[in-house]
Amino acid sequence: MTTATMDLKQHIRGIPDFPKPGILFYDISTLMRNADAWQVAMGRLTHAVAPWAPDMLAAIESRGFLTAAPLASNLGCGLVMLRKPGKLPGETVSHTYDLEYGSDTLHIQADAIRPGQRVVVMDDLLATGGTLAASVALLRKVGADVVGASVLVELRALGGRQRLDVPVQALISYDD
């Protein structure tokens, strides 16, 4: 199979009832373990994100780090981390957002983004869109021009894309 025709869905396994009953977890570790498939995935993501001409990629803790690091290298741009409380040194800016049951908070180092820098936010998966929407809001708080969001996997049935006011590139989509 050539890289152009490789079906990356074949390298992602679904694990039922994880992390709790009724959830089908899409495990990207099987994609990462296959060097050829991982290189194809990173090449396709690079090709998808390049037209946005980002100055910086913003990676959401923790699986967003896995895709953002190789893409930043491929694109020749910087990388910043969006992390949970207490994980970043120095002064941080935070954004708290609601979850189905409770809330969560993301932080960015206060000096990580220069106002007006073009930023693409990256995560492994887009489901309901709550974390990506919060990340976009946080990045705008520090002056970023958020030009897009990129994920490995999108679960279209959950409608997360509709919560975002930036273009979204998903490498793999599941409709159910």
From Swiss-Prot:
Protein name per UniProt: Adenine phosphoribosyltransferase
Which GO MF terms are attached to this record?
adenine binding; adenine phosphoribosyltransferase activity; AMP binding
Under the heading InterPro entries, the entry gives: Ade_phspho_trans, PRibTrfase_dom, PRTase-like, UPRTase/APRTase
Q: Name one GO cellular component term.
A: cytoplasm
| UniProt entry tagged with the keyword Cytoplasm | yes
Positions of disulphide bridges: none
Provide the assembly information. Answer: Homodimer.
Gene name per UniProt: apt
- HAMAP family from the entry? Aden_phosphoribosyltr
Record family assignment: Belongs to the purine/pyrimidine phosphoribosyltransferase family.
Localization per record: Cytoplasm
Q: Which GO terms describe its biological process?
A: adenine salvage; AMP salvage; purine ribonucleoside salvage
The entry's function note states: Catalyzes a salvage reaction resulting in the formation of AMP, that is energically less costly than de novo synthesis.
**One Pfam family this chain carries?**
Pribosyltran
What domain of life is recorded for the organism? Bacteria
Q: What is its EC number?
A: 2.4.2.7
Assigned keywords, A-Z? Cytoplasm, Glycosyltransferase, Purine salvage, Transferase
Which transformation does this protein catalyse, written as a reaction? AMP + diphosphate = 5-phospho-alpha-D-ribose 1-diphosphate + adenine
Metabolic or biological pathway: Purine metabolism; AMP biosynthesis via salvage pathway; AMP from adenine: step 1/1
Query: Among its keywords, does the record have Transferase?
Result: yes
